[in-house]
């Protein structure tokens, strides 16, 4: 992995940078939630606005004692070339696979990959380890049924924000049971990989409600199943790490990419200039550039690129 400064930040045209900057100048900034009552209100408001895609096939995974809802979106007008198992973001406490339907449908059509979105259980009603248990169950289900259900064993695992954290912990669990090799790659977008108080990045989020909701009951949050940056990262598949320079979790992503590389894994780190958390899901030129680059990486990593 090349950590030379010139290679760290992606090139963005002046026009795209200006248009993207204008979008964020007029967009209200998100603020951290103060507690459970506010979380319930935000969840209710999001639910009222949520309209999932009619293309999504809703199913349930039953694996190792866990029952996990999933949403499957297949590519239109082309055969399934592979499968992306995707964990949505939302601070561990308000994710929804349906909220990603539009994004997942675009990716399915652009790549030929079926996208399986996972509705893992949410904190604080279901704190750690509920979410990684559900994500692991979904991964094990896909490994077992991919050939019969989708006609392919070309699998890739990914997550967005909190979902990227869960993707990393899921891979570590699979690796420990000799199953991580079933996935040809991992897509990690803007995850939080240190929920402890031991590093500056960990201390930066320690007072946020999502930490309390997800893992506030755990005395040592540096355990790898919560903070994967502290884990033994050897033996993981090729990984793409994507983050923006204005993202509060930028240090976490630099740390995770460096530790993955130091452990001998193939790592691609892409940092986009002047964009905040979750930028790749925003309707901006830079967001679209990142999404297209991710599509290409997914196909190349699975050996499906042109």
Where are these regions (language model features)?
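Catalytic active-site module of serine/aspartate enzymes centered on a nucleophile-bearing elbow/loop
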Residues: 284-306
